[in-house]
């Protein structure tokens, strides 16, 4: 009897996993098809004989941007698949929190400057973990804050270490997160109601997987009067 129950539970688990896989494949196909459709349209426009040089350069720039988005999508999906498969071995090395935050944000400095946004980093102490993977996790969260903060806004990151954990708090003075989106923002392929057409809904999901894979936690909440706040903790022992 117990064997029958166990087999039934395994069958139900397999059925759920197959359904999840089918949904994921459908989501991935849709995510890739959207920019590919735009690329096809751009190629058609580039073939017009009366195209001015200025217009051609504009279309080529848009084409490169779309190709970069597809490249980022595929790279991120491959990282997620590696984490899903359990093939990632996170390093355990002592890393300065200041070094971690600066490296996490380095690719975002120019986009922030173009938006007139201010980035403030206050960090003290260290954490034990994998520097490259954790940079990826934090960079995705900061990028999300940047995209939801108006021009001239501010993003502030505070990091400190205590006897129990190393904590990183990322705050912005942007639009915040709608109450209905808040419980779902770390879910794979979830797009909030205020997300633009460029969002794939996987950056924050990847961040959570990387942080959780190192025994850490991440939560999001709204600030008063405006803005969002992400709190990351890497624990020094089992919690």
Model region roles, listed by residue range:
Residues 65-70:
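Short alpha-helical segment of the dimerization/phosphotransfer core of two-component systems
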Residues 145-146:
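Short helix-loop "hinge" at the ATP-lid/N-box region of the Bergerat-fold HATPase_c
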Residues 152-164:
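Short beta-strand/loop element within the Bergerat-fold HATPase_c
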Residues 172:
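Acidic ATP/Mg2+-coordinating residue in the GHKL
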Residues 177-190:
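Short conserved segment of the HATPase_c
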Residues 203, 207:
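Short alpha-helical Gxxx[C/S/T] motif in the catalytic ATP-binding
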Residues 216-217:
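Conserved glycine-rich
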């Amino acid at each position: 009897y117990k064997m029958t129950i166990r087999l039934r539970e395994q069958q139900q688990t397999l059925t759920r996993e197959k359904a999840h896989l089918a949904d994921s494949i459908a989501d991935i196909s849709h995510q890739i098809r959207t920019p590919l459709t735009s690329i096809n349209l751009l190629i058609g426009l580039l073939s017009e004989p009366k195209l001015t040089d200025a217009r051609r350069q504009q279309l080529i720039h848009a084409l490169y941007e779309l190709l970069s988005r597809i490249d980022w999508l595929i790279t991120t999906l491959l990282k997620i698949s590696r984490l899903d498969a359990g093939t990632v071995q996170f390093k355990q090395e002592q890393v300065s929190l200041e070094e971690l935050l600066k490296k996490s944000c380095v690719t975002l400095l120019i986009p922030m400057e173009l938006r007139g946004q201010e980035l403030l980093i206050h960090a003290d102490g260290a954490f034990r973990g994998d520097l490259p993977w954790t940079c990826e996790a934090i960079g995705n969260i900061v990028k999300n804050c940047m995209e939801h903060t108006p021009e001239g806004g501010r993003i502030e990151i505070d990091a400190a270490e205590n006897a129990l954990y190393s904590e990183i708090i990322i705050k912005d003075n942007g639009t915040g997160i709608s109450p209905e989106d808040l419980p779902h923002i770390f879910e794979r392929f979830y797009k909030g109601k205020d997300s633009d057409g460029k969002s794939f809904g996987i950056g924050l999901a990847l961040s959570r997987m990387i942080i959780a894979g190192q025994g850490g936690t991440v939560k999001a909440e709204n600030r008063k009067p405006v803005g969002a706040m992400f709190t990351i903790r890497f624990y020094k022992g089992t919690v």
